Amino acid sequence: MTDGNLSTSTNGVALMGILDSRPGNHIQNLQHLTLKAPRSLSLPEYGPKLKLSALEDRHSLQSVDSGIPTLEIGNPEPVPCSVVHVRRKPSESEIVPERACQSACLLPSYAPPAPAGAEREQSVRKSSTFPRTGYDSVKLYSPASQTLQRSDNVSVCSVSSLSTELSTTLSVSNEDILDLVVTSSSSAIVTLENDDDPQFTDVTLSSTRETRDLQRDCAGETEEGRKLRLLGPFSHFFTRNSLARKQNARLDKQSDLGWKLFGKVPLGENAQKDAKKLQKEYEDKAGRPSKPPSPKQNVRKNLDFEPLSTTALILEDRPANLPAKPAEEAQKHRQQYEEMVVQAKKRELKEAQRRKKQLEERCRLEESIGNAVLTWNNEILPNWETMWCSRKVRDLWWQGIPPSVRGKVWSLAIGNELNITHELFDICLARAKERWRSFSTGGSEAETEDAGFSAADREASLELIKLDISRTFPSLCIFQQGGPYHDMLHSVLGAYTCYRPDVGYVQGMSFIAAVLILNLDTADAFIAFSNLLNKPCQMAFFRVDHGLMLTYFAAFEVFFEENLPKLFAHFKKNNLTPDIYLIDWIFTLYSKSLPLDLACRVWDVFCRDGEEFLFRTALGLLRLFQDVLTRMDFIHVAQFLTRLPEDLPAEEFFASIASIQMQSRNKKWAQVLTALQKDSREMEKGSPSLRH
């Protein structure tokens, strides 16, 4: 056992020592040392005031408080006790313990007389201490008879029993260290105090049989201690594990007889019973089941509404300090309460039906998506060239492509007419990174000029890319600086500006590239992005071909008037031209205006039908909200169409698109657009939308 450490071996008793390494802590005499018993085991006993001389007090502990030990006794019945009086023989420098009392009754209080010759004027409050030469050991003959062995440099040590029945506290005010080993099946208080502070007593509680057993264990341990002292400083190498095993064995042996935590098993009269039997007997007596209830017992087997919150809000009776309710008022309140419960049940039933319907729709959608994935992977994609235009594939396409195969289908549908390879993407990306570095380091303008495009134009494109990326799907927070897709989006847009310097970067491209990146790898997204922007409609808008853009607007108005004549007239009356709302929709392919999942479904059919579906989708939106739009003026219509509602119903939206007929006087979209392109060269005002 090392200095400053105190160990215990019963019921989780823990001892802690506090080292005091100040030099010169020597006490010459032991004034008085008595271990006392209180009159009651629940309260401390106060003794007469004792004063020590200033010389003796000068060697006492001054850096810590006087130490207030605590006594917590939960057992109100008398317990067999044994009290120890420790006295010093006048002829020997040894402290000999004396058995003072052992009975099953409560002990009388005892307080020693004040020492003679004490100077009360110069005395201060301080604890009595053991002299270094006054003793070798102090043995407490309690049921946990152990040894107080002298060591060095301790000022205060306290013992607190972790037993749930009683509490044990040992407080020793001494200039020397005390290594204590306390073994107790009950609890006790040991206080070596001789001052003005409250006088606490040394009490150990146990039975006689347990006392003898513990004394035998202590005697064996004392014999081992003498052997270990012969080994000198190497003793701890041989006993480090053996002592721990013995202490653990005693702990296991005695913990079986004690109380379980939280009072599950009280200490019975027959301590030899098995702990499981005691547990069962106590549970039977208390009427509690031996096994915890199954979690399934708490699960509601039906979904019937139980208005628990409503019943908690309604009080049946008034408080006792108020007059009782009249019979009429009580009946009225009871009826109101029943009506509230009925309404609550109706609301809960309606909500449950709504949730059940949503769950059924979700399950049906997941099942249809799973079946569609199998169909696309096993039947359509292996035979793409022969099946992509079949009626079955078109029907599946309209219902929406499963996300797991969407990127592959988009790549096949868009095609690669430009024959862009992954190596070309790497070259364009490397050139873009080189230009970014040159701009950041202030490179010369001559190094960055290429194909007639000045460095200022390229720098403007790079700044616009940086600004536009930060505004791309801001709610997702994945394309902004530090997001997982920021670098990928920056690479695709930068590589495209190097691939098509004549087009450069136009605001709105970031949304198209972002949707492709969410479904394809970076290189494949770049290939699809380049081929998609090479389509006639996208090239007209991104190159800002004003004449061709007006032709597309004129073709749109032809089918607008054919399908929605009433709304078309309302727009004409308020001078609402298509460019107010179509430019944003076409530039971003609805990825900015519609929710992302709905925009992806629009992209699915757009990859199948081409640019015609973009204008058909616009007519479907106008048809879906035509009742609202006809009651709005110019400003409100423009605001509504540029900021569509976020909770668009997908099925109603696509049903509205399906109702749009893309035929006008037996002419389809392509035929009408071609005719308008021819007429635009001859007649600049061939359509109302072309009038300036």
From Swiss-Prot:
Major localization class: Golgi
Record's signal peptide: none
Segments for region (Disordered): 270-303, 315-335
Phosphoserine carried by residues: 91, 294
Biased amino acid composition, Basic and acidic residues: 271-287, 326-335
Domain of life: Eukaryota
SUPFAM superfamilies with a match to the protein in the record: Ypt/Rab-GAP domain of gyp1p
Pfam assignment, any one: RabGAP-TBC
Record GO cellular component, one term: recycling endosome
Domain Rab-GAP TBC: 400-610
Keywords for the protein's UniProt record, in alphabetical order: Golgi apparatus, GTPase activation, Phosphoprotein
Subcellular location(s) per record: Golgi apparatus, cis-Golgi network; Golgi apparatus, trans-Golgi network
GO molecular function: GTPase activator activity
GO biological process, one term: regulation of autophagosome assembly
Keyword flag Phosphoprotein: yes
The protein's role, per its UniProt record: Plays a role in the regulation of starvation-induced autophagosome formation. Together with the TRAPPIII complex, regulates a constitutive trafficking step from peripheral recycling endosomes to the early Golgi, maintaining the cycling pool of ATG9 required for initiation of autophagy.
PANTHER family assigned to the protein according to its UniProt record, in alphabetical order: RAB GTPASE-ACTIVATING PROTEIN 1-LIKE, TBC1 DOMAIN FAMILY MEMBER 14
Subunit architecture: Interacts with ULK1. May interact with RAB11A and RAB11B, but does not exhibit any GTPase-activating activity toward these proteins. Interacts with TRAPPC8.
Descriptive protein name: TBC1 domain family member 14
Species this chain originates from: Bos taurus
